[in-house]
Amino acid sequence: MTVEKQYGRLLKIDEEFGREKLGLMSGGVWQEDPKRLGIVLSRYKFVGKMLQGKSHVLEVGCGDAFASRIVAQFCDSLTVLDFDQIFIDDINNRENARWKMNAICTDFIKNKSGEEYDGVYALDVIEHINASEEDLFFCQASKSLKSDGIAVFGTPSLESQVYASIQSREGHVNCKTQEDWKNSLRKHFANVLCFSMNDEVLHTGFGAMSHYLLFVCVGKL
């Protein structure tokens, strides 16, 4: 037993579920830049609060889905997609009976999900999509939503790229300003609400001084 009895529950959780493992991507972050994991988790909490109470939610471009459990805590059911089978295998290998999610390997741009969801979100995804396919991606996201659904997108700002790592810059093929992303999203959603983050701090400040951009979209067109 633990010295303080209230911590005895931790031993019971460990016995029932085992010791939790980081995913392929989150594990790499924890090794190379531990503070970044806290920043990533805060982005997922924002999404969770925006989609709180939704029945069925879809994440596009989930990576290892380690942080996706935060969103799962706020909704009834979570489906996560990625086009890389390595990440989907990693998710399934770490499956947790208490926090089950449906993990699917598919290219979202080429293959519509086939379902309508109450919420759709994508964090750190749209900057990886070529500008020529951007409208198709948002069109797919809109089609995947119910009429009263909410979409949330998060992406690093164009202005932040001078501080991005070499690894990040290699994959970032479509970074924009807050205003440019808003204009792109308004082609597909009637209402686009803009938020910003600097590290884990959420705000509605000047877009050009924001490291990370978040868009909450309502009213699909």
Regions found by a protein language model. Name each.
Residues 1-121, 132-139, 144, 172-180, ...:
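Conserved N-terminal segment of class I S-adenosyl-L-methionine
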Residues 51, 185-186:
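Hydrophobic C-terminal alpha-helix "anchor/cap" residues
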Residues 124-125:
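Short catalytic micro-motifs in class I SAM-dependent methyltransferases
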Residues 128-129:
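A short His-aromatic
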Residues 145-151:
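Short glycine-dipeptide loop
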Residues 153-173:
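Short, glycine-/aromatic-enriched active-site segment of Class I SAM-dependent methyltransferases
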Residues 188-190:
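A structural motif corresponding to the C-terminal end of an alpha-helix
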